[in-house]
Amino acid sequence: MIFSKISQVAHYVPQQLVTNNDLASIMDTSHEWIFSRTGIAERHISRDEMTSDLAIQVADQLLTQSGLKADAIDFIIVATISPDATMPSTAAKVQAAIAATSAFAFDMTAACSGFVFALAMADKLIASGAYQNGMVIGAETLSKLVNWQDRATAVLFGDGAGGVLLEASKDKHVLAETLHTDGARCQSLISGETSLSSPYSIGKKAIATIQMDGRAIFDFAIRDVSKSILTLMAQSDITKDDIDYCLLHQANRRILDKIARKIDVPREKFLENMMRYGNTSAASIPILLSEAVQKGQIRLDGTQKILLSGFGGGLTWGSLIVRI
């Protein structure tokens, strides 16, 4: 049988740094108010780089680190809710920029679960035997979706990108998987609506910026995500003691605190970086993974079991247990 493994990781964030104090100068908020509720102290905001620019930086790093030629890449998946345009896809721009002429490329839209969903799909593509090498990148410029007059949401989000290179392997590395969607609760977190605009249309005004029912999302993350992780471990016969690190979507420190207690995993196993990047949606998990590799916490030698878990708009949530 053929399996997939993560062989390389990379991340990139825009240079512009915006602190909580910077935000306090343009809206009614403070560092203390933001940090005490979210654990976020600063975030990176793009001045002129588009989502594809961030993703291209990551793709270039992955190629350089791997030593592969661009034409060895079979597919590129970019998870994003903030593409440059509806078409072409952000992934198509990445494919062109790195001259991966043999690769097919497409975007995945699953909000903050996007990287986990895309990684699960990429694993199946390689397991099919038809493809050997693929890139999975989460990239966002959420700053263009934020209502900068709404302090409840504007303080939460940042821009950035992270990704992995997947290669074929004779050994199984994706050990367990669970993916979920509940469209009945989709109105809890929305952005980027478009209006019907033909001469024959009568429609409501679209909501372009991020709108969130914070309490509903907070409760959803604690209840549904915790339950799915516990079910995943039980079904796969993997215990909490088997897990080396938990890399969850970086939405809010209090969410991580409560999930850690719910699944009874030591809090120190939960890596976090939301204090420096904010919520980067589909980019948050791969950025966290890349930083953990840089710090030597995760070794990429196939000896550690890592829980990856994303949750967000859709509503979507999903988890993978991966040997890295």
From Swiss-Prot:
Chain residue ranges for the region called ACP-binding: 250-254
Q: Which GO terms describe its cellular component?
A: cytoplasm
Residue positions of the active site: 112, 249, 279
Any idea which UniProt keywords this protein has? Acyltransferase, Cytoplasm, Fatty acid biosynthesis, Fatty acid metabolism, Lipid biosynthesis, Lipid metabolism, Multifunctional enzyme, Transferase
Question: Where is this protein found?
Answer: Cytoplasm
Q: What is known of its domains?
A: The last Arg residue of the ACP-binding site is essential for the weak association between ACP/AcpP and FabH.
Q: What is this protein called?
A: Beta-ketoacyl-[acyl-carrier-protein] synthase III
What gene is this protein a product of?
A: fabH
